[in-house]
A protein has these predicted regions:
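Helix N-cap motif at beta-to-alpha junctions
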Residues: 15-17, 77-79
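Polyanion-binding surface elements
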Residues: 10
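Conserved beta-strand-loop-alpha-helix junction that forms the acyl-donor binding cleft
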Residues: 13-16, 37-38
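Vicinal oxygen chelate
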Residues: 1-7, 26-74, 81-109, 120-123
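Conserved active-site tyrosine of GNAT-family acetyltransferases
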Residues: 19-24, 86, 113
Length: 123
């Protein structure tokens, strides 16, 4: 058996509205979903990977985590524009856009403090 790819990235948040606006502003086409079992949440597919944001009650989101840190990374067409949008939404800057050996990148924190890397790798 081997891992052949990612199937899902699920974020739990107590700041659902703020987190939804943040990721939608970065270009994720998140739409409301309700499967009848569990909370209404927002989701989309990015390159075949299910990305979802779920609301979590106080303590619920923490109990679903093992205590580690989750970092999300997105390929974007324009790192500087994505960074500016994130900053306008109040994202905390970890490091500003910079050229890397493989392309351009920036790192910010989403409304819950998770690191979000914005990348562009020229083809």
């Amino acid at each position: 058996m081997k891992v052949t790819g990612f199937s899902a990235v699920i974020l739990w948040t107590q700041r659902i509205d703020e987190t939804l606006r943040f990721y939608q502003a970065l270009g994720l086409p998140l739409v409301e979903e309700d499967h009848g079992e569990g909370p209404i949440h927002y989701a989309c597919y990015i390159a075949g990977v299910h990305f979802a944001i779920f609301p979590g009650e106080i303590g619920e989101a923490v109990s679903r985590r093992s205590g580690g840190c989750t970092q999300v990374g997105f390929n974007v067409s324009d790192v500087d524009a994505a960074f500016a949008t994130a900053k306008e939404l109040g994202a905390k800057v970890v490091w500003e856009p910079r050229d890397m050996p493989w392309g351009r990148a920036a790192l910010v924190r989403d409304p819950d403090g998770r690191p979000v890397e914005l990348n562009h790798t020229p083809q």
